[in-house]
Design a protein with these regions (language model features):
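Non-heme Fe(II)/2-oxoglutarate
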Residues: 1-84, 109-113, 119, 128-132
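Catalytic core of non-heme Fe(II) oxygenases with the double-stranded beta-helix
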Residues: 79-207
Length: 207
């Protein structure tokens, strides 16, 4: 069974080169139809061997999940707002590589990634087997996700934060995508000082 959460510090051998490359990518304009705050790069950041490195760490061969923004970067400033909140990811496993400057990571209010419990149901993740699903009283996962996650995503009073993984330059956070999570608020006033991350959405490698 995959670990629900793993933190790997000092992940890249040259994180400053990755950061420069991430900032050099083209980014979509804020509010261009997505639900998240901030803006995503229009192409992936090229980091040689990242899929293989994560595969070795968890002991399962992984590839980028089709239909996701695997490898793309996200830039979020303090002023950016989004429509969605707590969510799950459409992937086998998820990851976030933090690329904000060290001095910005330690400023008050500079958050990493938050994990939540749904107050009404007591759930911290989507059930992973039939027995767990039956215990929730829901007949299928679609109904559960629709009425727990999608319905309450933007209602903070429905959720209790159970953990915040602090942001740290060159920290890789790996986690089960079925845990209820959300990015902590953005920060900074420009790309240099903002919240900069590389998004990773993994699928099992074919073959």
């Amino acid at each position: 069974m995959l670990p629900s959460l793993t933190i790997i510090d000092d992940f890249l051998s040259d994180p400053w080169a990755a950061r420069r490359a991430a900032l050099a990518l083209r980014y979509a304009l804020p509010g261009t139809g997505r639900n998240y705050p901030g803006r995503d790069s229009t192409s992936a950041l090229e980091v040689d061997g990242i899929n293989a490195a994560v595969s070795r760490h968890i002991g399962i061969d992984l590839a980028g999940a089709e239909g996701t923004e695997h490898g793309h970067c996200r830039l979020t400033l303090k002023s950016d707002k989004g429509r969605s909140g707590v969510h799950v990811d459409p992937a086998f496993y998820s990851g976030i590589l933090y690329l904000s400057r060290p001095e910005d990571c330690v400023k008050p209010g500079a958050g990493g990634t938050d994990f939540f419990r749904h107050k009404r149901t007591g759930l911290e993740r989507v059930p992973t087997n039939g027995a767990e699903l039956a215990a929730t009283g829901y007949d299928n996962l679609d109904d559960l996700v629709g009425t727990v996650v999608n319905k309450d995503t933007t209602q903070p009073s429905k959720w209790e934060r159970v953990m915040r993984v602090p942001i740290r330059f060159n920290r890789l956070l790996l986690f089960s995508p079925w845990q209820f999570h959300n990015s902590a608020p953005g920060f900074g006033t420009d790309p240099e000082s903002g919240r900069l991350v590389m998004l990773l959405f993994f699928a099992k490698a074919k073959g």
